[in-house]
Amino acid sequence: MPLLDSFAVDHTRMQAPAVRVAKTMNTPHGDAITVFDLRFCIPNKEVMPEKGIHTLEHLFAGFMRDHLNGNGVEIIDISPMGCRTGFYMSLIGTPDEQRVADAWKAAMADVLKVQDQNQIPELNVYQCGTYQMHSLSEAQDIARHILERDVRVNSNKELALPKEKLQELHI
């Protein structure tokens, strides 16, 4: 099985919160696609709570689009990582990490402005697979955590696992 890009970086050295370009590619028509690792938590030390990350998933996607789409950028998808330490964001375009970090912080400020669980988009049995598994207060705790610590940039060059380590891990 081929080694996925996300497993070629050293998770023990990742900073959080931080933005990292996880992958870049071009479509057959030449459009640039960038996948960002938006790392909310330090891997293996912190984790976002289940209900909070789910609520954040509903809010974050719209708020990030409000702040990042335009000027050659269009978000395709924002999805939580299975390890619950962050989100992957796929988009058309090549914004720099600082632009993404600024949009992320603005989106977190928007999360803090949501006053009632009824304001969470698609929070109903028809549009959500686990519509009762939500917590606005947990999502807002996550947002506060990001804004209190600021957002850094994780460099692939600094985080790359050496070939020797990959061989040692039998990858």
Curated annotation (Swiss-Prot):
Record's catalysed reaction(s): S-(5-deoxy-D-ribos-5-yl)-L-homocysteine = (S)-4,5-dihydroxypentane-2,3-dione + L-homocysteine
Ligand binding (Fe cation): H54, H58, C128
EC identifiers of the protein: 4.4.1.21
Domain of life, source organism: Bacteria
Signal peptide, first to last residue: none
GO BP: L-methionine salvage from S-adenosylmethionine; quorum sensing
Cofactor note: Binds 1 Fe cation per subunit.
Coiled-coil regions listed: none
Gene Ontology molecular function, alphabetical: iron ion binding; S-ribosylhomocysteine lyase activity
Gene Ontology CC annotation, any one: cytosol
Cofactors (names): Fe cation
Gene3D superfamilies to which the protein is assigned, alphabetical: S-ribosylhomocysteinase (LuxS)
Keywords: Autoinducer synthesis, Iron, Lyase, Metal-binding, Quorum sensing
InterPro entries: LuxS_sf, Metalloenz_LuxS/M16, S-ribosylhomocysteinase
Oligomeric form and interacting partners: Homodimer.
Function according to Swiss-Prot or TrEMBL: Involved in the synthesis of autoinducer 2 (AI-2) which is secreted by bacteria and is used to communicate both the cell density and the metabolic potential of the environment. The regulation of gene expression in response to changes in cell density is called quorum sensing. Catalyzes the transformation of S-ribosylhomocysteine (RHC) to homocysteine (HC) and 4,5-dihydroxy-2,3-pentadione (DPD).
Annotated family: Belongs to the LuxS family.
Stored PANTHER family: S-RIBOSYLHOMOCYSTEINE LYASE (PTHR35799:SF1)
Protein's UniProt name: S-ribosylhomocysteine lyase
